[in-house]
Amino acid sequence: IAPLVSTADIAVCHLEAPIAPPGQEAMVEPQRISSAASITNALAFAGFDRCSTASNHSVDRGAAGVDATVAAFEAAGMGQSGVARTEAERLPALMTVNGVKVAHLAYSYGFDGTPLPAGEPWRANIIDPASIIADARAERALGAEVVVVSLHWGASMASNPTADQQRVAEAVTASGDVNLI
């Protein structure tokens, strides 16, 4: 896919699984998954610029998995949105694409019952229209001209949006601060 992906002005992917912490193996268990750090190098090689990392599996490996995920993207020279090592890192850096400053934000519907690390609600972004709008406004205050939001949501095996998805999308786009979901 590299010839196709690398021609895009900006190429964004989604990584469903967090990266396994150093010294731990990638895993696939019922309800808990993680990937090897080498996947970020493969995504960079394919031409992706950044990935959304907010998913129902974002905190499957706890804070160590979040830290490993951010570090793996940094090592691959890629950006990511959706998880953070620190509260200050929660809002991603702006990208400049053909002279336009672009923000990419990412959120998940939840974490399948896995709690966020105690006292660290900023570790992974959860879908909340007011928070999304506030984050988009913060990115605009930093100079973003375009704000793109990736939402990890939906009902399994459903081809139509739920009423809640429609409500969230309408609220977020009506704000005027988000250009694209």
Language-model segments: residues:
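Acidic, metal/ion-coordinating pockets
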Residues: 1-181
